[in-house]
Structures are given as structure tokens and as C-alpha cells.
Amino acid sequence: MADISVHPSTWPLYVWLSLLVALPAVTFLYDAVTWFRMPPGPTPLPFIGNKLQLPKSKPWVQFQEWSKKYGPIYTIWIGRRPTVIISDPAIATELMETRSSKYSSRPRMVAMGELLWDGASILVKPYGKEWSVRRRLLHLALTPKALRLYKPVQEAEASRLAYGLLGRPNDYVKLIETFTSSVVFCVAYGHRIDSLNAKVIGQRFEFMHYSASLNVPGKYLVETIPALKHVPDFLAPWKKDIKKHGLKEAAANMDLVDVVRGDIARAEQESSKEKLPDSLCKILLEMRETENIPLSDRDFSFVPASLFGAGSDTTASTMCTAFLALITHPETLEAAQAELDAVIGPDRTPAFEDEANLSYIRALVKEVLRWRPVAVLGGTPHASTEDDHYEGYYIPAGTTVLGNSWAINLNEEYYPNPHHFNPLRFLDGNIAARVKQAPMTTVHLGEKHDLELGGKAHPSKSGHSSFGWGRRICPGANLAANSLYIALAKLLWAYDIKPIPGRTYDTFKYTEGFNIRPQPFECIIRIRSDKHKIVLEGEMEHAETYLEKFTPFGE
């Protein structure tokens, strides 16, 4: 028998051949044992997993189909890395909220998280102290008290949106994007947006689209072989390009902080600091003067910047979905306007103080969020940090956990006839105690609907799963919900939003990507009466006066 205890360079050829066979065999055996212990899913191929079975377009639809075959929790494999897909809100809540101490991290994202952002963004930060610091700072702008302070801004911006549609109804998408962007920039930096041609808006959309392009499974080999991140830039042009974009975004973020720093300095010189609008960036800069914030200037600048991605584009996409829902389900517009006419009347537009009395409008906002969730795959995936078991299945540490919001929000066990847009699902004050009612029941608005209130009770208070779960839930969820309420309430009070006669609308025709919105469509947006127009013109004057203190960013 050959002695192989000596240096490997002296080993016989058959020893090397044996190792070449044994190592893959042992690896395959280990993966197979793990595969059998995890929630069952489509059979993976050795070493490449289910890559060949993953669709290049709209994977959430395929994931929904697999849930019908394999159940509400199953596993797919990207190479040798397991991903648990969840299609039931109760399971998502159990794992990512009840057991949040185990499921609040992020999978490693080399291209986007490490090369582009160098770990600065809270979006991709693993769960731990550094994430907690950023989350705490971000929450300073999103406390209940802070959210109340932003309501006048949101009302004024919603009035500008409603007035803008008088002269530019065909530009409703751009006007909506201006509205959502301006709200977020007022909150983050104390400056408004008057036009999408503003330089800062062009930059934000460029950064957002580029980062999204990096977060595509299989696009970069570095996600499978992380060691490739250490290849010198001159040998890896793809890496050089990513880092170049990262430096550009970081510089833009720090420029915005410098703008607010300059605002504070001028206000102090002029003894007019009380006139300077509060913003997250202003609050953080003042905090930095009195306490230690363990972040570099670069990392610090990413905190207020993160509000744009969390609350601007996604809210605009939801508003576009609302328009699509209204023109394909015209009975909802009639019901909404019946409530608005009864509660508000013709002499003013709705305000936040009316929200408690506008139960149908509140329900409509929730149904929009449920019907076509923007973050179809639940936003950025979670990752487990400890070995765990669920219903007898093994979930090892390091598993990517993905809540398929598309499948969850369209789960027929919770939402009968789920593709029918029906705000009445959310009219019951206690959503968790919904009771199935007979179809075509007449409600107090005089509207007839298939109430579709049967099914299981959703575990969350909101009744849907569109903002994520647990410690990783979207921090701007309440800010976004407030913007949706006030904008839709004012627009439905003022306008008839209807389909073009003879036009067919496809409610499944949405963009690609991890955040979706309807493909561009035309509709009729017509002011309801001359009196409504006069009210909008008057409220526009008040809105412009209020927003004067929020200096606009230039083009």
C-alpha cells in the first residue's frame, strides 16, 4: 500500500484521481442530505441547483405555480445555496416576525452590497450592530410624532398634484412621480421637487435603476464565487464599472448632506433657524454635534438617501396601479365618490382629519397595496442566522428566505377571487375577524359588490403583506400609506378616472424587475365640475404658500 503521509507533491496519480472523485461525491452527498431535510421543492441538479428551471421573466409567477405543487413553503437552489420560498402570510409571519431573531439578516450580495455600496446601505446590511445604528437613525424621521409633522407637507403636495392634472391629465405618471419625490425630499432634506427635470431626481433614478440591475440572480459570477471580488480592477472591467457607479452615488449623497449643512449655517447666521424646516438630515446633523454617531461621512450620507428608494418610486408605482384598478373596476370609483360626496361635500377637498370617516377610501388604499404589490418578491430577501426547524423541516443557517408577496397577496385561502379588485375586503374594522357574507350585498354606500370577505384571517393588522415583515419591514410604510391616502382621496374627490371607450386593459401587463408597475396606459381624467375646479385652484394657492419654506432643488 502506498504511503501518502508524505508531501502531496509525491502522491501517486491514483490518489489524486481518487480525491477528484471523492470531493465532489462528498459535496453532493452533503447537499443531498440537506435537500432531503429542507422543505420540498423542484428537484435540483447537482451543483447548479434549479438555475435551469428559473424563468428569466417574472419569476414570482413561476414561484406561485410551484407553491400550488409543493405547498406554501418550499426550497429552490441557486447553485449550492438554498432559498426558502414562502407563499402563505401565516408562515411568513411565524418565521420573519415571531422568529425574527433568526430571520432578520440579509444574504450576501457581493456586487450590490459590497462593491457598489461598500456596506454603507441599510438595505443590504446584515443584521447586527451596524444595521441597528442605521435603523435607529432612520426611524428618527418616521416616528408617529414625526409622521404627524409631515402631514401638512403631504396635503400641500397632494393639492399640487390634483391641480396639476387640470392642465396635464395625460402626464399623470410624471405628476405622480413629482408628488412622491417631493414628499420624500421634503422629509429627507427639507427641499421640495418642482419638476422631474431637477438634477437630484435624475441622479436618484439613475442610481436606483443601476443598483437594481446588479440584483439579478446569475448575472454576476462573483455572487457564486465571492473571491472574484479581489481580482484587480484592471483584470475585471465589470468590477471597475460597479465601483465607479458606487463612488458617483456616494458623492451625490454627501453633496445633499452638504446642502442641508449649508442651510443650517445660513439660518444660524441670520438668526432664523426656527424658519428652517425640519428634515431627517437636519436632525441627524444636529445629533452629530451632541453625540457620537459611529458612521463615516460616507455611511452617514446613505441614511437620509435611503428614504428615496423606500418611499418614492414604490409609492408612485402603487398610485399607477390604483388608476389601473379604477378604470378596470369602475364600480369602485362610484363607491369612493359616493362616500366622499357624503362626508366631504363639494366645498373643499379631503384632509387627514377626515380619514377616520372615510372608511371606503382607507379600504381602497389597502386593496391597491394587496391587489398588485410593487415589491412582488417581498423586497430584499431575508437570511437565517441560526439553524432552525419549521413543521419538521430543517432550515440551515445562511438560508435565503423570500416571501413571495405576489403569491401571498393573491392567496385564495385568504382572498377569494383574488384578482378581483374589491376594497370591501377591508371594510370590516377588525380585519382578523372577517366573516364571509353573501355576494351582491348592498352596503351603506348604495353599492353592490361580491363582498369576497371569506377566507382565513390575515395575521397582520394591515390585512396584507406588501411592506415586508418583522425587523426588516419597510421603515417608510406609514409615510407611504399616508401619501397614498391623501393623494387618492383628493384625486377621487376631484376627478372622474375612467377607461377610454372601446379600449381593452390588461391588468397583468406590468414591468419586469423586483419592483413592478403597470406598463404605460392611457385613461380619461376629467374634472367632475367647475366647482371642483375652483376649489382646486384655491387650495393650490394655499399649498404654494405653505411650501415656500421648502426651497426647490434646481434643474
Can you annotate each of these PLM segments?
Residues 180, 314-332, 337-339, 478-493:
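Cytochrome P450 catalytic-core helices
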Residues 2-117, 129, 133, 152-160, ...:
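N-terminal membrane-proximal hinge/A-helix region immediately C-terminal to the signal-anchor transmembrane segment
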Residues 58-84, 105-126, 136-193, 250-270, ...:
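Cytochrome P450 catalytic-domain "roof"
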Residues 330-332, 477-523:
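Cytochrome P450 heme-binding "Cys pocket" and the immediately downstream C-terminal segment
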Residues 43, 202-208, 269-282, 325-375, ...:
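Cytochrome P450 I-helix active-site segment
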Residues 403-454, 540-541:
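Conserved cytochrome P450 K-helix/beta-meander segment immediately N-terminal to the heme-binding cysteine loop
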Residues 120, 305, 352, 391, ...:
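Cytochrome P450 heme-thiolate "Cys pocket" and heme-binding signature region
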Residues 105-115, 148-319, 335:
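Cytochrome P450 heme-thiolate monooxygenase catalytic core
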